[in-house]
A protein has these predicted regions:
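Short, structured "edge-of-domain" segments at secondary-structure transitions
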Residues: 1-180
Length: 180
């Protein structure tokens, strides 16, 4: 189950801020992206207020977006940013916002038994990262993945051995201090 909250308190570790914080206002919409590849529009003011680390019970995503799917990421609904998502079968896809005026938008055409494991903002200067259940990691330039339309199926991102799957995907801004 995903952890959903809005707060004025940033996470304790600034290096992880891209995983939890999305600059927004109380009058804007965000997209809660679920493992089935669908972005669900949510008005920021409809998200419960809590303090990370001090709240023992976080809200159930089903009560907010009406689905039992797992929330894997958060995106800005109206931003013209470019995002990348990765799937458990190793597919990667980039697309550019803003998202259309709908309550739900499919972001990727998933293959059978595939699911989204992560989504993040990914400009051309970013590095995309997959981690597998076999402890393999692949880091490659986001610029090597051409942005596609929202209905497209993406492209091969990481080659997986039989029985392996990607369990995590994100985008990193690499600096001279970045260690992977």
């Amino acid at each position: 189950s995903g952890k959903l909250y809005r707060t004025a308190t940033p996470p304790m570790d600034p290096a992880e801020s891209h995983l939890r914080i999305l600059p927004t206002t109380t009058r804007s919409d965000v997209g809660l992206v679920t493992n089935d590849g669908i972005a669900h529009a949510v008005h920021v003011s409809d998200l419960p207020v809590s303090t990370p680390g001090l709240t023992t019970q976080l809200p159930d995503p089903e009560s907010i977006i009406g689905t039992s799917q797992r929330v894997v990421g958060l995106i800005s609904w109206r931003s013209e940013a470019t995002y990348a998502l990765g799937t458990s079968q190793g597919t990667v896809k980039r697309f550019t916002g803003p998202l259309p005026d709908k309550q739900e938008v499919s972001l990727i055409a998933l293959k059978e038994l595939d699911e989204v494991v992560g989504i993040a903002e990914a400009g051309d200067d970013s590095e995309l990262t997959f981690i597998t259940n076999e402890a393999n990691i692949l880091v490659f330039p986001a610029s090597s993945v051409r942005p596609q339309g929202r209905g497209a199926a993406g492209m091969a991102g990481i080659k997986l051995s039989d029985g392996a799957k990607a369990i995590y995907f994100t985008s990193l801004k690499v600096t001279k201090d970045t260690q992977v």
